[in-house]
Every structure is written in structure tokens, then in C-alpha cells.
């Protein structure tokens, strides 16, 4: 029996003039523009399909916590009984506000008192692609995660954050006891060739990286509180950054912690796909086949014709979800 599961979705209206003006006031020359470029705040205008997908494919969800600076989509019905509007100021300590960092917004989610112990964190570009069961996310009230060790090979500036995670994880879990004591959670048919990563990891000490699934992430509220208790100084420093920084950590740290404390159940590799917006043909194929539970459509530097690509994807979603959800006016 799975306890109540809440969804949490974060959203920013990058076109809001009030938000943009406040952002400008706090912008500083940090020399790392790729971490805070405009594509991070560009609106694909697909968010209504996120709600349509939830209503159709996950009607069992307890509540949806909509995290916002203060703005709301014009079409959103804020009076829906399952929808909880939460402003940053409602749960993030005032010394961290205003914030323009998704890491700060996510690292403090455990402070939302009404949020259930089991919750699933979405960004607004991660869509439920087919029918979703509670057991796809939690089993025995534990989050289902990919327990695959994969070497971190830095290729972009954002990878500093993953390196920061490994510094913490190796400080606490250098011996990988969970791997040695619960091998059945690290070796299974569903991992295919990725089992080799875990096999090789037996022969060396320390953790050199994890294989990440860019999908909606199941979390335990208590894990956030535990890490804040153990690494409060570090997290406080991260949360004082107004913008994302190479010295940050993010909510993936909580997932890794759950793996190393054996507070998880294995997830399948086919749980989701991460596809750049520019690869619209692949997006169409994944939506049509419905083999993956989640689809992350990422607007990144590969998107050359933003308007055309978004319009193409919107037509696909409109065909799949033609009816308004009850979350829409």
C-alpha cells in the first residue's frame, strides 16, 4: 500500500515584467552566462498539456503543489481542489529571497508543511507520456531510482554541480556498503549493459558518478531534512546564491543519498526519455509509441528555430490531449 503521493511542479513566467525587472536588479557579472541564459526562462507554452496529462494518466495524485514566484498562467483555474498554489515567500526563508535559482527553490521544498512525505518533483518540461501507477514511482513507500554507478565525464559547466555532489557522497559513503549488502538492487536484467558499470565499481573504492534519469523525480521529504541537518552550512551557502552557480548542489543529491542509505527501490531504464526540442521527430515518435512513462522536452542551445519547433510539438500534444483539463478555466 502506497501512502499519499503529491506532485510538485515549478514554473517561471520569463515574460513577466515585474519578475524580469527584479531579476535585473540582482544580476551580477559572474562570468558564467551559460548557467543563467535566456533559454532557461523561455516559455514553450506547453504547460496546459502537462495538466491534461496528469489528469488523464495520474488521476490518483493526492495534491499538486504549484511553485511560483507569484505569477500564474492565465488559463489556470487556481480553485481546483487538488491544486495548491505556493509562492516562494510561503516556504523559502526570507534570507534567500528573491531567488532566481531553481536549486534554491527545490532544496527548500521540504519546508512546505502540508507536502506529503512521498512526493514527485517535476519541472514544467517533463510530461507524463502514458498511464502512470503509484508503483511506477514508489514501492514499499520508497522512491524508485536508477542505482547505476557511471563515471562522471565533465563536458559542460553545469557538471561542476555533479562533482560537488560526489564530494559529499564520498565523504559519507566512500565504502559503498549498500552495493555490497544489497546487490540485488544494483544488478538486474532491466539494466542491460549498464550492469557492467556496477560490476566495475566493485573493484574500486569510492563513488565516481551516477547515471541520471532526466524525468520526474520521486523524493522523500525526510531525506531533505536529514541532509539539511548534516550539511546545513553548505546548503545555506548554496541558497544564498541568487543565481545558479558552479558551487551549487541540487535535488539530485537527495536521490543519491536515498540510494546509499538503501532508502530506495530500483527503477527501470525505460522510465523516461530526455529529448532536445530541436529533435521534434523523435519527440513525435515517443509520444506516439507511449513506451516511456515520462518525456522531458528540453529547450537548449540546439534549438535553432524555437517558434517552429514549439508549434510542431504543440500540434502533437493537441492531438493527444484535445480536451481541456479541469485545471483549466
Curated annotation (Swiss-Prot):
Domain of life of the source: Bacteria
Pfam families linked to this entry: Stealth_CR1, Stealth_CR2, Stealth_CR3
EC number(s) reported in the record: 2.7.-.-
Residue ranges of the TM segments: none
Disulfides per UniProt: none
UniProt keyword list: Exopolysaccharide synthesis, Transferase
InterPro entries attached to this UniProt entry: Stealth, Stealth_CR1, Stealth_CR2, Stealth_CR3
Record-level Gene Ontology MF annotations: transferase activity, transferring phosphorus-containing groups
GO terms under biological process: polysaccharide biosynthetic process
Family: Belongs to the stealth family.
Other facts: Stealth proteins are part of a protein family that is conserved from bacteria to higher eukaryotes. Family members were first identified in microbes as proteins that help pathogens to elude the host innate immune system. Microbial stealth proteins are involved in the biosynthesis of exopolysaccharides. Stealth proteins are predicted to function as hexose-1-phosphoryltransferases.
UniProt-recorded name of the protein: Capsular polysaccharide phosphotransferase WcwK
